[in-house]
């Protein structure tokens, strides 16, 4: 029987050398293990990541309180439950915590248990996790958003915008798309080196050179695509792919440079320029006309609903507008966005909400309302590759899991290669069809 016999948590280190929670779930006949990621630029509406706050130990970032919550309160409550009853398990976790933002037990405690239970349930059922969650229809490999150049909170340079990404959508298989991304990554490295710029990589494996402007950053990426021998889209594509193989995606992380007191977007790392919400929306409108941009994530700040509305009206018909800090994988926030008519896509980060069931609910709500979903990592990752399984399980069609370096990022890409191989002729790579613009 798949009855939970023990839940055991421990403190491990993530890809930035910070503590995080890992959970083991044991049943009478199966086992599941999951490790929890952590973000650098976090939305104010995210579920609470419980940290110890003892400055003398791991600079206050220890997670022993969360570990203790798993090993006592959660273990005692869930032992004896059927591991295959995921919704019941997740509801029990929510009831145990009893707060709207998981601040009592910690979202990092709840998520580790939720994901480990799913893995134990999959093992008991004799199924890969993507089949266990998604059933027989789970067969879509995601188009990757590959973060090759960094700025903002992810880099100590003069670039305001956090992530410049490539999306190899013009291919028939995930493996070919991955090869394209890797070759562009190496072409970009050679290009930076030829210009005497740094090729050190940041938290997510992307380069973070000291550039003169935000425009130089995107232009370098476009140049690297060409040097790798691939065709990039053109502004005349209006967000479409045409016969191009690669498009650009951005994550400016606009909340990070929004001054709520001034109600201005301040380019504090580069020109010191200050823009109103309307001017910021017009700025992105110009970029979407000048560059082959298919997707912009967090183009406006997390609580600038009016700015989001203007941006959506201006370019939402031809550019995927992804809400990350805006929606924080929260169905209530997403429902508000749908009602207001803002954005057209949601970034899905499992640790923003805290349980697998809530994550799947948000993806389902997005699908029912014509919004796309992008399954995402965090800047602080581990070797855990659950998000690769979730991307295929939900047929999301897109994944954001870093650059083409660092083994914590490669773990997800390599898992997707294995899934594609396992699916064989059933595997489907959506390419341009992953977008609804």
From Swiss-Prot:
Mg(2+) binds at residues 251, 297, 324. It catalyses: (2R)-2-phosphoglycerate = phosphoenolpyruvate + H2O. The active site is at 204 (proton donor), 349 (proton acceptor). The lineage of its organism: Bacteria, Pseudomonadati, Chlorobiota, Chlorobiia, Chlorobiales. PANTHER family: ENOLASE. Belongs to the enolase family. This is Enolase. InterPro entries: Enolase, Enolase-like_C_sf, Enolase-like_N, Enolase_C, Enolase_CS, Enolase_N. It comes from Pelodictyon phaeoclathratiforme (strain DSM 5477 / BU-1). The keyword Metal-binding applies. Binds a second Mg(2+) ion via substrate during catalysis. (2R)-2-phosphoglycerate binds at residues 162, 349, 378-379, 400. Its EC number is 4.2.1.11. Pathway: Carbohydrate degradation; glycolysis; pyruvate from D-glyceraldehyde 3-phosphate: step 4/5. Its cofactor is Mg(2+). It is an enzyme of class 4 (lyase). One of its GO terms (molecular function) is magnesium ion binding. It is found in: Cytoplasm; Secreted; Cell surface. GO terms for cellular component: cell surface; extracellular region; phosphopyruvate hydratase complex. Catalyzes the reversible conversion of 2-phosphoglycerate (2-PG) into phosphoenolpyruvate (PEP). It is essential for the degradation of carbohydrates via glycolysis. One of its GO terms (biological process) is glycolytic process. It holds the Pfam family Enolase_C. Keywords: Cytoplasm, Glycolysis, Lyase, Magnesium, Metal-binding, Secreted. HAMAP family: Enolase.
């Amino acid at each position: 029987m798949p009855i939970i016999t023990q839940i055991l948590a421990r403190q491990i280190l993530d890809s930035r050398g910070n503590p995080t929670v890992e959970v083991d779930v044991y049943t009478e006949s199966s086992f599941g293990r999951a490790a929890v990621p952590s973000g650098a630029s976090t939305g104010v509406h995210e579920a609470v990541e419980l940290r110890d706050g003892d400055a003398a130990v791991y600079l206050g970032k220890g997670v022993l309180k969360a570990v203790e919550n798993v090993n006592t309160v959660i273990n005692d409550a869930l032992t004896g439950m059927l591991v295959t009853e995921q919704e019941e398990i997740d509801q029990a976790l929510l009831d145990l915590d009893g707060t709207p933002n998981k601040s009592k037990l910690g979202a990092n405690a709840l998520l580790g248990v939720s994901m480990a239970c799913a893995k134990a349930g999959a093992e008991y059922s004799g199924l890969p996790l993507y089949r266990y969650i998604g059933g027989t229809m789970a067969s879509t490999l995601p188009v990757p958003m590959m973060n090759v150049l960094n700025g903002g909170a992810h880099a100590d340079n003069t670039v305001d915008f956090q992530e410049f990404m490539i999306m190899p959508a013009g291919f028939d298989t995930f493996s070919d798309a991955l090869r394209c991304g890797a070759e562009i990554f190496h072409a970009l490295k050679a290009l930076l080196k030829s210009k005497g710029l740094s090729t050190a990589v940041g938290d997510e494996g992307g380069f973070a050179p000291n550039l003169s402007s935000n425009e130089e950053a995107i232009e370098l990426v476009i140049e690297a695509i060409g040097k790798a021998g691939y065709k990039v889209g053109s502004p005349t594509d209006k967000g479409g792919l045409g016969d191009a193989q690669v498009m650009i995606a951005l994550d400016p992380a606009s909340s990070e440079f929004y001054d709520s007191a001034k109600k201005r977007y301040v380019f504090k790392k580069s020109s010191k320029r200050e823009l109103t919400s309307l001017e910021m929306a017009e700025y992105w409108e110009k970029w979407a006309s000048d560059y082959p941009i298919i997707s912009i994530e967090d183009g406006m700040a997390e609580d600038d609903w009016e700015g989001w509305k203007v941006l959506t009206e201006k370019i939402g018909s031809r550019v995927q507008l992804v809400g990350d800090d805006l929606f924080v994988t929260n169905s209530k926030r997403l429902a508000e966005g749908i009602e207001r008519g803002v954005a057209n896509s949601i970034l899905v980060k499992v640790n923003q909400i805290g349980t697998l069931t809530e994550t799947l609910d948000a993806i389902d709500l997005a699908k029912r309302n014509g919004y796309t979903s992008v399954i995402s990592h965090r800047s602080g990752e581990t070797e855990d590759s659950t998000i690769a399984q979730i991307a295929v399980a939900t047929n999301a069609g897109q994944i954001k899991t870093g650059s083409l370096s660092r083994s914590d990022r490669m773990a997800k890409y390599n898992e997707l290669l294995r899934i594609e191989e396992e699916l064989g002729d059933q595997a489907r790579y959506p390419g341009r069809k992953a977008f609804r613009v």
